[in-house]
Structures are given as C-alpha cells and as structure tokens.
Amino acid sequence: VYLAGTDFGMRAFAGNFDPDELKAAVAYAHAHNVRVHCTINTMPRGDEIVRLPAHLERLNDAGVDAVIVADLGAFTLAGKYAPNCQRHISTQASISNYVTANAWYDLGASRVILARELSLEEIRTIRENTPAELEIEAFVHGAMCVSYSGRCLLSNYMTGRDASRGACAQ
C-alpha cells in the first residue's frame, strides 16, 4: 500500500493520514501481510526540513516498511531517523539512467522508481546495468507534464500552483 502522511507528500489535496490514522493503517495492513510505503516525495525547503526528523520517527515507530523520497537531504534524514524503513527513490528524482540508479543504490536505496518518460528499452538498459538486489519500479502511465518528473515549472507558471510542492494542476 502506498500512502502519505499529512506532510511531505505530493498529493496536496488528498485526504492523507494523520499520525494516528497512519499507525492504524500500518497495523491493519501488516495484519493482512501487506507492506506499507509512505511517500515523502516533496522537495522540503529549509523551514520544512526541520519538521522532517519527527515525521520520520513517527513513521519508523508506526512500522512503515519503506519511505519513498526524492530529495537527497530527506533520504539522508530517513537513514538516521527511520532506520527500520527501507529507502525508495521517487519518480520525482528523475532517475533516467543506470549511473544515477547505481549512485542511489550505493547510498543505500533498495528501490528506484524510474522517471516516467523512459522507453521500455531504456528501462531494460537500466536493469541490465544495476545490481539484481536493487529493485526497479516503472510507471506505465502517469502525468502528462511537459518536463521530466520532479522538474515541473509549467503548472506553477500557468496556475500559480507549484507542482514541486504537491499542488500540480494537471
């Protein structure tokens, strides 16, 4: 199950989980042998990053299986404050080649979620040039953004809604 807490998720207008709901959802999922992956895929600014350690500790304490991050700072904090959670790299990080996938793996990522814009052949090349232990995830559908994943400026320009803050107007 993929879900988000009330902070740091890219779905600003979704009914995300408060800490108590998240803990209950994780317990329910685990009772049914289902893993829970929590998104932390915004790019936190300085005034937001200070809240991230407490959020990560709550996720760790709730038993979340993996956190999905896009930002290197969030990735680093997840290793420190959510040591029981696997770290997955969001499509928002725009991983579009095997060198980048391997770099994230070397830093401790167990899964990379590739940029949505890749062809099947490009995905195959990444798989063939990364360790078998590194899980690869790829979207087969998705946003129609005029950009690479995680680098959208058009939404903000056209509507004043910042896609990199979870408010994409797509």
What kind of region is each of these model predictions?
Residues 1-95, 99, 113-117, 121-170:
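Active-site pocket-lining/capping segments in soluble small-molecule metabolic enzymes
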Residues 108-109:
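As written
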